[in-house]
């Protein structure tokens, strides 16, 4: 008897007609749609640049055979990162004008001591490259800190609702939220995130056509809310997007004014190690996230935000000691910020 041959079931659904978004890489798009790179068809040469030019039409087989999140864009990428849309936004003035709990709140930061709450928001925005508007909207949605008073004692001490004594206080709560959103945002860019998981273990596949900013929002709210609550939160007419519009106006209009984050035709420039040719330095650590620790027990075993590697010049003593060796730029460009820890 000849053995029977079983073939995988075919999905008869029509292929996706997907228009590339700013920041899309071929490998990441393939991972999000669950296909191989060679199966993606386009009239454009997708290997010519590091990123696919925005608006490029891609024909992609439909291999999605499981429930997905809604294909509704909630937040443009330019309103997630600390981009040109934040130019001119005065966090202190906005918070004081709202006259809520945050306007008189002070927080303690280990690096600088006691600071005003709005200054802490600005610091978190700059250090993590996240829009201050987004942080304020999250703080208002979850805890009513910006325009009123905390909704209860839990949200006074844990404003994002993450009830863990290691994360007590506004800045550490916002750091928790930022880290989760960044895991999703950059994971979507890299093609390493495809699903969200709710507290009860239920999973949903992220619609592959979403932008990274939307994925960050969907991912964060799935961490502490049930699927039914989450569905209400992401409702653009009555949930978090509606609150965001109410507080700050149309984010998509601001994003359109500044254009895509990544210009068309972008090619990754070559990078060099950050020390002079011939100098002896040691590779001392990394890759790791830029600020604090991404604990696997909090964020999951497979998630991190790789943004830094560590080098140290040769020295007579071990440990952190002053050194006059030059640090050089990894690529041509402007130095736009130099502070402690940077």
Segments from the language model and where they lie:
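Solvent-exposed loop/turn segments at secondary-structure junctions
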Residues: 25-27, 64-66, 141-146, 167, ...
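Peptidoglycan-targeting cell-wall enzymes and recognition modules
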Residues: 79-120, 127, 134-209
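Secretory-pathway/luminal and periplasmic proteins that interact with or process carbohydrate-rich
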Residues: 49-52, 65-67, 133, 143-153, ...
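Surface-exposed, glycine-biased beta-strand/turn segments
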Residues: 252-341
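Extracytoplasmic/secreted proteins, especially bacterial periplasmic and envelope-associated proteins
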Residues: 25-28, 32-35, 39, 53-54, ...
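Non-catalytic cell-wall polysaccharide-engagement segments
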Residues: 163-284
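Sec-exported extracytoplasmic/periplasmic mature domains
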Residues: 31-35, 42-45, 60-63, 126-130, ...
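Primarily a LysM-type cell-wall glycan-binding module
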Residues: 2-36, 56-58, 62, 81-123
